[in-house]
């Protein structure tokens, strides 16, 4: 267990999913947490209630990350509530899988506004507070920054931008005592991912999905939360500018798919199985 007692943490996009798991884990380890949401007030309130009921300190804040002004307001309000800031987790983001030629300018701009511009200006807004505490910025990216996936061109571009942003911001802020790191989760299925499939056995679906991952199981929001807590701790003080991949081994595989496997089999024989 890593002690976070007395630490003050802001986790963006923490009303549901990974962000919620990160916020709850920081709270379990003793941190006071500012929970942010853009439209999931119910989830954010539930996160806060769970923390407060366990004896912790938390409050929910709403901010639309499509604009910069609400980001700056969130920074001020969260820091005022917490009494300072030790850790910023830039987790808020949106995804989109859409054919390249059907992506609109509005969709493109929205993804980059929320996934790239928002973390940039959120970090900028809290630098004075993090400089006082010699704090940490954790940018949540994705394995889409490192591996291609069909119809994810825009989304993957935003995740790659976060990895590069993390590396460069780390160099800018290290002399001021602020450590910047990244965390790139693989697929972490949560119940909300299955809302378009009523009647499905969610636990079974998650178990089946886990069989496709080298680890043999799918990660959970708490898994990602525990890694985030580690990255924010003194134990990770020598990790600067790097983005840690946490995906159960997904990106270690070399997979060509059946269409590529056929000519490779013809060339090397039936015993050749790409990626094994």
Q: Where do the model's predicted regions map?
A:
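Conserved glycine-rich cofactor-binding loop
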Residues: 8, 15-17
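Active-site loop immediately N-terminal to the catalytic Tyr-X3-Lys motif
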Residues: 101, 147-153, 175, 216, ...
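Residue(s) in the substrate-gating loop at a strand-loop-helix junction
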Residues: 142
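Alpha-helical segment proximal to the catalytic Tyr-Lys
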Residues: 128, 171-175, 237
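Active-site helix of classical SDR
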Residues: 123, 158, 166
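Substrate-binding pocket helix/loop in short-chain dehydrogenase/reductase
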Residues: 99-100, 104-112, 209
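C-terminal helical subdomain
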Residues: 105, 182, 202-239, 246-248, ...
């Amino acid at each position: 267990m890593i002690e976070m007692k007395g630490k003050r943490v802001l986790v963006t996009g923490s009303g549901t999913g990974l962000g919620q798991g990160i916020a709850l884990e920081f709270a379990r380890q003793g941190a006071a947490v500012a929970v942010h949401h853009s439209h999931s007030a119910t989830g954010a309130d539930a996160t806060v209630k769970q923390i407060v009921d366990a004896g912790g300190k938390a409050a929910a804040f709403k901010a639309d990350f499509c604009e910069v002004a609400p980001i700056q307001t969130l920074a001020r309000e969260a820091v005022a509530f917490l009494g300072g800031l030790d850790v910023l987790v830039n987790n808020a983001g949106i995804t989109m899988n859409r054919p390249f030629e059907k992506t609109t300018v509005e969709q493109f701009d929205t993804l980059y506004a929320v996934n790239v511009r928002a973390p940039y200006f959120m970090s900028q807004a809290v630098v004075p507070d993090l400089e006082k505490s010699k704090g940490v910025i954790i940018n949540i990216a994705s394995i889409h920054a490192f591996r291609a996936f069909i119809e994810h061109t825009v989304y993957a571009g935003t995740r790659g931008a976060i990895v590069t942003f993390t590396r460069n911001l780390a160099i800018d802020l290290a002399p001021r005592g602020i450590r910047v790191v990244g965390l790139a989760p693989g697929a972490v299925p949560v119940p909300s991912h299955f809302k378009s499939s009523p009647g499905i056995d969610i636990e079974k679906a998650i178990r089946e999905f886990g069989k496709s991952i080298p680890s043999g199981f799918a990660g959970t929001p708490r898994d990602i939360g525990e890694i985030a807590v580690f990255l924010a701790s003194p134990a990770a003080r020598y990790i600067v500018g790097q983005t840690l991949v946490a995906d159960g081994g997904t990106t270690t595989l070399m997979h060509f798919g059946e269409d590529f496997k056929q000519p490779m089999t013809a060339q090397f024989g039936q015993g050749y199985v790409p990626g094994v």
